[in-house]
């Protein structure tokens, strides 16, 4: 059994912290020296940022998680999971899939990681279908306009 089966779901990432709660996390990081703050303080702040409704906050959260991933081998699996969620929220589904794939590759029996990967893949498929529908609608509109113009040119 994996040691990260207690992590939040994607749905949990949409429960934003209050501005006051997020500021407390930010102040903790600053009081510890900012970039040299403890991994735990930066991690808590990063997760609070990812949960935000503001895309810029989310991007900063993903950046902090990326830094933590690089700096702390002990937090890599956890960082991958949270990075996948952060990228998912930002609509960066290809990156979310990369992180989820990496996590599942290391922990194939982790049910939460597999569920996260499946959700990301479902979103990619849904977005792909929406894109195909938009392209199809665009092509139909162009064909209709071309047909109309060709009829107008006939004497």
From Swiss-Prot:
GO molecular function: lipid binding; molecular adaptor activity
Any GO BP annotation: positive regulation of mitochondrial fission
TM regions (residue ranges): 131-150
Cysteines engaged in disulfide bonds, as pairs: none
Intervals, Cytoplasmic compartment: 1-130
Keyword Transmembrane helix attributed: yes
Location(s) in or outside the cell: Mitochondrion outer membrane
Membrane topology: Single-pass membrane protein
Keyword annotations: Membrane, Mitochondrion, Mitochondrion outer membrane, Repeat, TPR repeat, Transmembrane, Transmembrane helix
Database matches in Pfam families: Fis1_TPR_C, Fis1_TPR_N
Signal peptide as annotated in the record: none
CC annotations in GO: mitochondrial outer membrane; peroxisomal membrane
Mitochondrial intermembrane side: 151-155
Domain remark text: The C-terminus is required for mitochondrial localization, while the N-terminus is necessary for mitochondrial fission.
Entry-linked PANTHER family: MITOCHONDRIAL FISSION 1 PROTEIN (PTHR13247:SF0), TETRATRICOPEPTIDE REPEAT PROTEIN 11 TPR REPEAT PROTEIN 11 (PTHR13247)
Function, as annotated: Has a role in mitochondrial fission. Has a role in outer membrane fission but not matrix separation.
Family (UniProt): Belongs to the FIS1 family.
Name used for this protein in its record: Mitochondrial fission 1 protein
Organism encoding this protein: Eremothecium gossypii (strain ATCC 10895 / CBS 109.51 / FGSC 9923 / NRRL Y-1056)
